[in-house]
């Protein structure tokens, strides 16, 4: 079975689940990961990094470790994933922007980290009237916490949500914990990834699956307005991810 046939088969199964009932997607092994416009264009299609004075990039912590993390978008097959090396003391505020850039999101919507009943988001995004505390939920300012405050051991997992309308959910896995050499710079590094990020505001999981099916087959879903398919233009390619260009772009975030 070719890659395209595999992709289409997974889309068909996903659509059946949406129509006949939701079934959780199976866990993805890390073995699956190793297959290898704005006017101011850059590989991720993004904007400049917010001024670092808006939040601390790194927090004061002792014994800073080298974390390898893998972020994957939930509910989409084939998996859209990125792998990064980050210092364990990276602030959640800075990490949130790093993850949006690495995935390919344009930072046009709210985002948050979740671990259990603890939610972490930028202070500028917190509005008690819009997001009141619900039964046991504890809200934190992401500027005040670093990654090692919520992940410490290999295998730890945290959720990362983006765009509460389209409702994108990501899983962050702590793949490894290592030590820095004395002369090794402690910085953010993109080291792997595969498949393109969905377009902003395309309608969440269902919308993106519908776009992909049209891209591969030319078939339109019943009841979907013609204008919806304008997302699928000559630049749309679900399998596109320029790893080397993105590595260079992400390295610029360390400046």
Question: Where do the protein language model's features map onto the residues?
Answer:
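Short linear regulatory motifs enriched in tryptophan with gly/pro/ser
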Residues: 1-255
């Amino acid at each position: 079975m070719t890659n395209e046939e595999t992709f289409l088969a997974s889309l068909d199964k996903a659509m059946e689940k949406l129509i006949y009932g939701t079934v959780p997607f199976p866990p993805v092994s890390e073995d699956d990961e190793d297959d290898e416009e704005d006017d101011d264009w850059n590989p991720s299609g993004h904007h400049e990094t917010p001024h670092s004075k808006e939040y601390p990039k790194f927090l004061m912590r002792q014994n800073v470790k080298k974390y390898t993390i893998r972020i994957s978008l939930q509910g989409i097959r084939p998996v859209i994933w990125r792998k990064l090396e980050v210092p364990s003391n990276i602030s959640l505020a800075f990490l949130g922007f790093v993850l949006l850039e690495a995935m390919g999101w344009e930072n046009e919507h709210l985002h948050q980290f979740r671990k259990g009943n603890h939610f972490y988001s930028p202070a500028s995004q917190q509005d008690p009237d819009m997001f009141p505390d619900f039964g046991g939920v504890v809200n934190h300012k992401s500027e005040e916490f670093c990654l090692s405050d919520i992940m410490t051991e290999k295998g730890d997992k945290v959720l990362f949500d983006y765009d509460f309308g389209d409702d994108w959910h990501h899983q962050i896995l702590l793949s490894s914990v290592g030590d820095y050499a004395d002369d090794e710079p402690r910085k953010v590094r993109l080291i792997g990834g595969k498949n393109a990020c969905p377009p902003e505001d395309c309608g969440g999981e269902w919308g993106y699956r519908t776009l992909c099916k049209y891209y591969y087959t030319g078939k339109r879903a019943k009841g979907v307005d013609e204008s919806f398919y304008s997302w699928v233009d000559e630049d749309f390619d679900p399998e596109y991810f320029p790893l080397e260009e993105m590595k260079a772009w992400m390295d610029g975030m360390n400046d």
